[in-house]
């Protein structure tokens, strides 16, 4: 068990060198893992379903994807500010012998470019005097197709895993694929494009085409964007040919070394192939 900030910082520093990852991001990931462990031990363990960047990073490795926050959906519960406040308070009060203290700072409704509404939770952790900010975005009633899966989340600094509920691979891909199709050149989140590429490269053999197809249709139906699916090939061509999109991709490559050697065309071809797989009869 890690007992001091010095010990933790040394471990993070060594991992940072090994993974060519930012030490500050790894520190935040460690604290996010501490929160996940509390979830896995709490009364909400069967309601809390991990999705988003933290799940993608776990699936592909921290050397191939970084993330700064937790995205989750809650099953079978109302997601209002009061309900989330009670839920988070209960989760962070779960006793875990790791020396980490969680403090709830702010809870607000998500009003930015969210696909559908949710609640944003801002917290901070303290470990041996070191303060780390955390953010959690929580939604409800997501279209998980065919269903969520039990996921063994491998810890960063320990040789063990946490058992949690998570999106299945096909739903992860479907949500991002729907976003790329429906938003086309208005989607400036290059991580969506990267995630589709890296997941297809590393987990392509695990994709069940029928589930991907069903998940894509269910996601589009949930978001009211079914009409865009048939025109996806044209949308992909428009996105790839758009100078601003390629400029955004180059900026993403400069910011994240794991994307440095990926051409824009290669990424878009991966996305086209995923769409073909999803639409195959």
Which residues are covered by each model-predicted region?
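Structured mid-to-C-terminal alpha-helical surface segments
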Residues: 1-48, 57-66, 70-281
């Amino acid at each position: 068990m890690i007992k001091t900030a010095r010990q933790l910082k040394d471990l993070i520093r060594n991992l940072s060198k090994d993974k060519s990852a930012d030490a500050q991001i790894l520190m935040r990931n460690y604290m996010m893992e501490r929160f996940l462990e509390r979830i896995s031990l709490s009364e909400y363990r069967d309601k809390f379903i991990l999705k988003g960047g933290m799940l993608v990073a776990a699936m592909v490795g921290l050397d191939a994807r970084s993330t700064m926050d937790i995205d989750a959906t809650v099953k079978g519960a109302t997601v209002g500010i009061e309900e989330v406040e009670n839920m988070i308070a209960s989760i962070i009060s779960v006793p875990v012998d790791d020396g980490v203290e969680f403090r709830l700072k702010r809870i607000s409704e998500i009003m930015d470019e969210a696909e559908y509404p949710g609640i944003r939770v801002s917290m901070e952790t303290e470990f041996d005097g070191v303060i780390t900010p955390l953010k959690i975005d929580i939604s409800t009633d997501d279209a998980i197709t065919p269903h969520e899966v039990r996921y063994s989340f491998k810890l960063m600094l320990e040789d063990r895993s946490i058992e949690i509920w998570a999106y299945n691979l096909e739903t992860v891909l479907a949500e991002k694929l729907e976003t790329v199709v429906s938003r086309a050149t208005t989607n400036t989140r290059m991580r969506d494009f990267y995630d589709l590429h890296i997941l297809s490269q590393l987990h392509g053999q695990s994709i069940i085409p029928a589930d991907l197809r069903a998940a894509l249709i269910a996601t589009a139906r949930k978001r009211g964007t079914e009409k865009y699916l048939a025109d996806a090939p044209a949308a992909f061509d428009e996105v790839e040919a758009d100078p601003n999109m390629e400029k955004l991709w180059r900026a993403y490559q400069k910011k994240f070394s794991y994307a440095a050697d990926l051409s824009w065309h290669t990424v878009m071809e991966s996305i086209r192939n995923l769409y073909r797989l999803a639409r195959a009869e």
